[in-house]
């Protein structure tokens, strides 16, 4: 009976450690995913002003050439 209790206690202890390691890994994966999302937003913030400035410079010239009213 004593060895059975020891074995069960050992299994419980190892299972608890394994479960806590899985939780830590899952938390790290979720944090990684959030970082990717934040990086996408950051790239988007840098990309939109660039496109807007290029359009602001290019569209008047294009309009002038099409209508020939410069």
Swiss-Prot record:
Q: Where in the cell is it found?
A: Secreted
Protein keywords: Amphibian defense peptide, Antibiotic, Antimicrobial, Cleavage on pair of basic residues, Cytolysis, Disulfide bond, Fungicide, Hemolysis, Immunity, Innate immunity, Secreted, Signal
One of the GO biological process terms: innate immune response
Residues of the propeptide region, as annotated, are: 23-44
Expression sites by tissue: Expressed by the skin glands.
Would you tell me the Gene Ontology cellular component terms? extracellular region
Leader peptide range in chain numbering: 1-22
Q: List the disulfide bonds.
A: 64-70
**Does Repeat appear among the keywords?**
no
Q: What is the predominant subcellular site recorded for this chain?
A: secreted
Keyword Ubl conjugation appears in the UniProt entry: no
Q: Which Pfam families match?
A: Antimicrobial_1, FSAP_sig_propep
Q: So what does this one do?
A: Antimicrobial peptide with activity against a variety of Gram-negative and Gram-positive bacteria and against fungi. Shows strong hemolytic activity against human erythrocytes.
Q: Which family is this protein grouped under?
A: Belongs to the frog skin active peptide (FSAP) family. Brevinin subfamily.
What this protein is called in its record is: Brevinin-1MT1
UniProt lineage: Eukaryota, Metazoa, Chordata, Craniata, Vertebrata
